[in-house]
């Protein structure tokens, strides 16, 4: 009986694979996100096309540098993703501006849903990412340079200079998502047990508690 089911299972898998590859392109001109709708199915539902306006495709927030004075890391990220530009819904792209104070850092983090390419607007940065084998790929980049961070790999940008710096970052996702290493591990809600982190990092529990004190849990 089990043997007789194999051809049926194989046929089902082939049909499913074909379905997964079908209609990969958009089936309408656009699908402006209806941010007021609580329903989410791997994205936002479409806004009524009759109610779409030019403002749905427009964002002015990247025109000027963001304030970095209140950032403990000396950096500020201004995102233009689907939550700020509803017209990006289903388009698979977004953009951000990152500003760095002198000595500023965009700490080690990853984007689980996107690769990233940065274009240096001003200044000089030390940037890099870690491969899954632990190799550091890093370089100093200058104004006008481009550097790429592969999807879901840990990466960072540091401004080691005495002048501000800024970049534009492009993503192949309308909502890349961001996980910063420090806050994710030491500021989770509910918290990761101290003994677990102590063993993972080869540290004593009091040291873990001290580090956690620097990362208040997100509400």
UniProtKB/Swiss-Prot annotation:
Highest taxon above the source species: Eukaryota
CDD domains hit by this protein: cupin_OxOx
GO cellular component terms given for this protein: apoplast
Glycosylation site residues: 70
A GO term, aspect molecular function: manganese ion binding
Cellular location(s): Secreted, Extracellular space, Apoplast
Role description: May play a role in plant defense. Probably has no oxalate oxidase activity even if the active site is conserved.
Stated name of the protein: Germin-like protein subfamily 2 member 3
Organism of provenance: Arabidopsis thaliana (Mouse-ear cress)
């Amino acid at each position: 009986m089990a043997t007789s089911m194999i051809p049926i299972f194989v046929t089902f898998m082939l049909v499913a694979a074909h379905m997964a590859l079908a209609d990969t392109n958009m089936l309408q001109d656009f699908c402006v996100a209806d941010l007021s709708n609580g329903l989410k199915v791997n994205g936002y539902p479409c806004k009524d096309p009759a109610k779409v306006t030019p403002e749905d495709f427009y964002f002015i927030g990247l025109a000027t540098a963001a304030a970095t004075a209140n950032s403990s890391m000396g950096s500020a990220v201004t995102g233009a993703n689907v939550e700020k530009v509803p017209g990006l819904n289903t388009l698979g792209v977004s953009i951000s501006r990152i500003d760095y104070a002198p000595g500023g850092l965009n700490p080690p983090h990853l984007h689980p849903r996107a690769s990233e390419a940065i274009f240096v607007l001003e200044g000089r940065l030390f940037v890099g990412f870690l491969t899954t084998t632990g190799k550091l790929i890093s370089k100093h980049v200058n104004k006008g340079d481009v550097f790429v961070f592969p999807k879901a790999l840990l990466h960072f940008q540091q401004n080691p200079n005495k002048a501000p710096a800024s970049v534009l970052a492009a993503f192949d996702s309308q909502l890349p998502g961001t996980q910063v290493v420090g806050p994710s591990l030491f500021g989770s809600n509910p918290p990761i047990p101290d003994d677990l982190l102590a063993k993972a990092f080869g540290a004593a529990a009091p040291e873990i508690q001290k580090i956690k004190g620097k990362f208040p849990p997100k509400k």
